[in-house]
C-alpha cells in the first residue's frame, strides 16, 4: 500500500508535504529526506484519527513512475483494509467477536494501530467479514 506524496518547495525553505488521498496529513521538512520521514509520521497519525472516528480510510491513488510515496507497513495496511471492510459490513465489534469466537477485547485490539496484532488474527477477522486477506511477494 503506497500513498503518493506531493512535495512542494516552501517559500521559507524546505518542503511542504501533502497527500491527495489523505488531506489531513500535512507536514514539512528541511530536506526531502526529512520531509518524507515527517510524511510517514503524518500519514500514520491521520490513520489513527480515522480509526478513532470509525471512518473509512481512502485507499491510495495509483502511482506515476515519478511520484514520491510513503509505503505503509504491512501491519498497518492490513488493519486499514480490515477497518474499511468492517465499516462496510455495518456489523458491531460484538458481532465480529461472536463470528470469530473471540472476546470483544481482542476485536478492539484489531482496530488499534499501536497493538502488534498477529496477521493470522487479521486474516480470521477478514474471513468473518466475507473477505480474503492475501499476501503477495513481487
Curated annotation (Swiss-Prot):
UniProt modification remark: May be degraded by Lon protease.
Pfam families xref list: HicB_lk_antitox, HTH_3
A Gene Ontology cellular-component term: toxin-antitoxin complex
BP-aspect Gene Ontology terms: regulation of DNA-templated transcription; regulation of growth; response to stress
Residue ranges of domain HTH cro/C1-type in the record: 82-136
PROSITE patterns: HTH_CROC1
GO molecular function, one term: identical protein binding
Induction, per UniProt: Induced by amino acid starvation, carbon starvation and when translation is blocked. Induction no longer occurs in the absence of Lon protease suggesting, by homology to other toxin-antitoxin systems, that Lon may degrade the HicB antitoxin. A member of the hicA-hicB operon.
DNA-binding residues: 93-112
SMART domains per UniProt: HTH_XRE
Summary of the knockout phenotype: Disruption suppresses an rpoE disruption; in a wild-type background disruption down-regulates extracytoplasmic stress responses and outer membrane vesicle production.
InterPro entries xref list: Cro/C1-type_HTH, HicB-like, Lambda_DNA-bd_dom_sf, TA_system_antitoxin, TTHA1013/TTHA0281-like
UniProt keyword list: DNA-binding, Repressor, Stress response, Toxin-antitoxin system, Transcription, Transcription regulation
Coiled coil: none
Subunit field text: Probably forms a complex with the mRNA interferase HicA; when the 2 dissociate the mRNA interferase becomes active.
Function field: Antitoxin component of a type II toxin-antitoxin (TA) system. Functions as an mRNA interferase antitoxin; overexpression prevents HicA-mediated cessation of cell growth and inhibition of cell proliferation.
Family stated for the protein in its record: Belongs to the HicB antitoxin family.
Protein name: Antitoxin HicB
Origin species: Escherichia coli (strain K12)
Amino acid at each position: 500500500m503506497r500513498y503518493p506524496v506531493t512535495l512542494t518547495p516552501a517559500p521559507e525553505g524546505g518542503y511542504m508535504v501533502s497527500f491527495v488521498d489523505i488531506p489531513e496529513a500535512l507536514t514539512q521538512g528541511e530536506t526531502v529526506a526529512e520531509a518524507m520521514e515527517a510524511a510517514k509520521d503524518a500519514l500514520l497519525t491521520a490513520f489513527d484519527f480515522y480509526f478513532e472516528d470509525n471512518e473509512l480510510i481512502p485507499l491510495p491513488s495509483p502511482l506515476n513512475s515519478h511520484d514520491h510515496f510513503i509505503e505503509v507497513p504491512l501491519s498497518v495496511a492490513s488493519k486499514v483494509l480490515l477497518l474499511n471492510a468492517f465499516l462496510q459490513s455495518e456489523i458491531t465489534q460484538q458481532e465480529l467477536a461472536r463470528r470469530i469466537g473471540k472476546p470483544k477485547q481482542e476485536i478492539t485490539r484489531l482496530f488499534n494501530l499501536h497493538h502488534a496484532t498477529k496477521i493470522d488474527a487479521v486474516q480470521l477477522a477478514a474471513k468473518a467479514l466475507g473477505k480474503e486477506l492475501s499476501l503477495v511477494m513481487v
